[in-house]
Amino acid sequence: MTQTLSQLEHDGAFIERHIGPSVSQQQHMLSVVGATSLDALIRQIVPADIQLPSPPAVGEAVTEHEALAELKAIAGRNQRYKSYIGMGYSAVLMPPVILRNVLENPGWYTAYTPYQPEVSQGRLEALLNFQQVTQDLTGLDLASASLLDEATAAAEAMAMAKRISKLKQAERFFVADDVHPQTLDVVRTRAETFGFEIVVGKAEEALKDDAVFGVLLQQAGTTGELHDYSDLMAALKARKVVSCVASDIMALVLLTAPGKQGADIVFGSAQRFGVPMGYGGPHAAFFACRDEHKRAMPGRIIGVSRDAAGNTAFRMAMQTREQHIRREKANSNICTSQVLLANIAGMYAVFHGPEGLKRIAGRIHRLTDILAAGLTQGGLLLRHRSWFDTLTIEVADKDVVLSRALSFGINLRSDLASAVGITLDEATTREDVLALFAVLLGDDHGLDIEALDASIAQEVATIPAGLLRHDAILSHPVFNRYHSETEMMRYLHRLARKDLALNQAMIPLGSCTMKLNAAAEMLPITWPEFAELHPFCPPEQALGYRQMIEQLSGWLVQLTGYDAVCMQPNSGAQGEYAGLLAIRRYHESRNEAGRHLCLIPSSAHGTNPASAQMAGMEVVVVACDKQGNIDLHDLREKAQAAGEQLSCIMVTYPSTHGVYEETIREVCQIVHQYGGQVYLDGANMNAQVGITTPGYIGADVSHLNLHKTFCIPHGGGGPGMGPIGVKAHLAPFVPGHQVVKIDGVLTEQGAVSAAPFGSASILPISWMYIRMMGAEGLKQASQMAILNANYIATRLQQAYPVLYTGRDGRVAHECILDIRPLKESTGISEMDIAKRLIDYGFHAPTMSFPVAGTLMVEPTESESQVEIDRFIDAMLAIRSEINRVAQGEWPLDDNPLVNAPHTQAELVADWAHPYSRELAVFPAGSEHKYWPSVKRLDDVYGDRNLFCSCVPMSDYA
């Protein structure tokens, strides 16, 4: 029969690309799990009282090309002016070799956080490069693998300063009055919950206050003046006050390292090393401290260890500081970093090398000197006599100057009294400087770049002598080897080949939702209309961004059942913090500041108690019953006991145990009965979208992991986005911003991140996903995630017991496999199974969370039956291998599991094992073979012999 045009115009094509199993595969999988249809399966699993009566109003699906065209038109409403606003954001020139081989390479952007180091050596090496850059430029002993942004890093520096301070009674933190305003904003917010008093003043005034435990200084002040704080920091040290210094990464190429001048903590944004402004992010922050304070440091740290063969290998070091282990006692609640952006920044340093960076920084500074000379010659007054790249110029009529600049397509800094600010960057040209002369001096300025360059006296130093760097930087061979594009391309390829990402295999990590990051979703993030905007540009230049964000927020309101969405949080953990802050502020507005107790089920993710502690709350643990559900009797008792001190409950749904708890609405009602609020963690939203909503269930606030449910890639450990949805009564208490007004959100609250819309440039990814899926496609995605998980549970339950199930023996979108009985009977652990999966070509599931001795598997909707069967077959084959150990065929200390993973080097070495080489490295054939570059890591050695810098080239695997 001939098809009509309407039938041939298939708008749902992307849905079929995104969802892995075909219709026929779905039917087969349904028959295996014993369900007649997807809808019937959902009715068996999801409590009837929380299922939505009608679909969310997010529209129908459109094709990839239609969505791209629609978004391109929206992006076209953004105006690409030359922005010299500065304030921590600058235009960059990302090397195309990095753009193509890192940012646009799924081998880099689809990987997960490197908890499994054997399949992560490439990006771990890249992060070690980033740490080495940080150490060299800051002059400190230890660097982290990045934080979320500069302002967040400042807040973390304050918290760390308090942890390491010997002045235990001091509760004041001093902030110099020339730090960036957005930094001060975020620091104030963090201090609010810690009970610290923020004192702002001239830097030298810090010595007048005996109750100060730490001081925040900025080496290159927000208006451009350079500061030599050596004497001040020496005086502070004598008084046991901790010195924290914010620094510009490009300026540090020419300026003295703050660590050499006495700073205890140094941080800043690495954005200038090749990462576009992107209307605020994502960007990596660098963070460094002295070795003696290493255990108080926030964020991830990459360290050098060795593998089972004694070879050098890399891993995440000192994880016992982090929230997934220490919970409310963790140094920070942040469980992500900005790995993809840190790797771009690190590779920028590798590609340019020390001489290239000096040339770039020197050119920026020289152009600034030329600009200053011309403006002075033209009769204008500069507020400072020292600078790296930023000038503050006194003007008679600021509004006239700003208006004239706009007519030239130029943005100047506009928030200074009787002055404008100009920050130059690596993209600035001679022609740009001439345009600035025309703006400030008139078209007939008569200035010549060459003449000004020649006229600048060598003895007139705009960088004070005491601030000039004299030591070598980036002397390690990795920064002096890959300067041709051929060598750089091959280096990046070698690193990517060491890692296991979604471009090679399914990553079945429970609680992580490693779904497809479609090419059509990724394309817009490199469009200059999105990439080049300054976050503090005039709002009329960002109409496209505002429209896109407004549409996305509206869709998320529909998909969550809330009344408003705040896009500011840069990660899920930051979203938790922001949501809990909203609850805290709501109680305070009702004169109920005594509500400080946060109920958290024992099954919760470690981020929950860490976030509660950061929000100034005290954690009370609620028990779970033998089925893994919240114990309602215990909940009632603890809610009643808390009484007027009850702030909220933090609950995940479906639960962290992988089931839909039947009593979730009753949980909400109990907490509300005693005056508390319900924080529903959005980690498992991939099993809710289109089926139910947190708002419909009865929650008051949630964060959404856009890097899980809504397709932003994990980037190897960041970026992420954690916007929060709130009911109307909490909307006035979500984060605001002191630099940029956030339209549509009625709040005067402090910020939690540096930019008003967080990592705005990756929001188009989620916009594209929702637009191409539509309401029906989004529901199908949730249904298929649930089917895939139940298919795995059904096929594996005889070999590996499923620890928790809900009604009718079903699971939600993930399942927990109990390895404890196997370990007791055979000695083979969940670690052994995880490492053996590498030989089969798979990333391990989540180990020992939320229950020790288990593996949690989440397949997502994007994996086909073929790939899922391959995983199941691997798990069943491993079960057979365990049987052979149990039967004595292989000794417990020498078998394919305890020796896993196996490397190519082993294959060609002497072989004395009781199993064959072929079984070791090709247990499932060679088609999907992944070769790990190292054997199992020695974690104990790595932490006992902490080394977090680049190793000699001869040590690289």
From Swiss-Prot:
Q: Does the keyword Ribosomal protein apply?
A: no
**What are the alphabetically sorted keywords of the record?**
Oxidoreductase, Pyridoxal phosphate
Q: Gene3D superfamilies recorded for this chain? A: Aspartate Aminotransferase, domain 1, Type I PLP-dependent aspartate aminotransferase-like (Major domain)
Regions crossing the membrane = none
GO MF annotations for this entry?
glycine binding; glycine dehydrogenase (decarboxylating) activity; pyridoxal phosphate binding
In short, the EC number is 1.4.4.2
**Complexes and interactors:** The glycine cleavage system is composed of four proteins: P, T, L and H.
Query: Function, please?
Result: The glycine cleavage system catalyzes the degradation of glycine. The P protein binds the alpha-amino group of glycine through its pyridoxal phosphate cofactor; CO(2) is released and the remaining methylamine moiety is then transferred to the lipoamide cofactor of the H protein.
Q: Which PANTHER family match?
A: GLYCINE DEHYDROGENASE (DECARBOXYLATING), GLYCINE DEHYDROGENASE, DECARBOXYLATING
What protein am I looking at?
A: Glycine dehydrogenase (decarboxylating)
The major lineage groups are: Bacteria, Pseudomonadati, Pseudomonadota, Gammaproteobacteria, Enterobacterales
